[in-house]
Each structure stands twice: as structure tokens, then as C-alpha cells.
Amino acid sequence: MSNQEVLLKVENLCQYFGMQGSELKAVDNVSFDIKKGEVFGLVGESGCGKTTTGRSIIKLYNITGGNIFFKGIRISAGKRGYQEAIKKAREDYKAAVAANPEKKVQLKAEMDKTIAEQTKAMKEAIFDQNNCDKEYSKRLQEACKMKYEALLARASDSEKAALTRSSRTRCARLARPSW
């Protein structure tokens, strides 16, 4: 896979915007490669610069710094060859989809299946955590109740004081479960 052609290479991309005498660093030193046939995702929190990165790559913004290479050719702002290459890539994609619509449907089905599996796994993990929390809470309440009963026994009856040690041990064991 490392021998695959690099379609898009982004090196130290910077996109700054001037705002009332100061600079907003929307994108700062972002680098990545996208190889032919590779599925690439740019993910992050809201407002972290994903859209700005994309817009900078397709030249909706003149980049502040860094380099962008498309099929090995360095792209400069507004370069006609780059715009033609992007246009051709879009046409190639549309032609590929038109020639094989089943592939697009199959890919969507696979993506939906993967998302459903991940959602199910997350729900199961949350359910397990909730059950674990409930069990821990129940054990802690039982342990505290036994400790309270042991204290009452110690205060009221010297014979019951012998039970205090064993219930304290049980209380400690229940309050700190092994999981």
C-alpha cells in the first residue's frame, strides 16, 4: 500500500485571518497525504478548522503558508492547471458513479452497517457501565448498612462486638469491588 500514488499532499498548511489588528489562526501547520484508492476523513471538534482546511485546499482561500500538491504538482493560488485537474477529477467521479451505480449503493450499505454496529457497541457499553454503577452503589449501601449495624451492636451489647470485626472486613471488601 505504501507504493500507491499520492493524489493530494498537504504540507504545513496555515490559514490565518486578520481580525481587528490581530490574527486568528484557523489552521496551523496541518499536514497529510491522501493516496489513490484511500478513504480519508478529516475529523475534529466544532470550529477546529476542518472546513477551512478543505476550502484552502480547493483554493476558496489564498493560503497563508504551506504547500499543496495535487498529483505531484505544487498548486499555487488560482493556478489554471489545478482548477482543470479538480474539474477532471469531479467528472471522473461522476462518470464512475454513472457507470457503476450498484457500487455506490453497496458502499453506502456497508457504511450504514458499520455505523449501526458501532452504535450498537456503544449502547451496550453504556448499558454495561450503568449496570456496573448500579451494582457498585447497591454493594456500597449494603456495606454501610452492615457497618452501622455493627456500630449499634458494639454500643449496645458486648457479645455482638465480636461480630464487628467480620462485618468491617465484609464492608471494606464490598465497598471496593475487584472490577
Question: At which residue positions do the language-model features occur?
Answer:
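ABC transporter nucleotide-binding domains
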Residues: 1-179
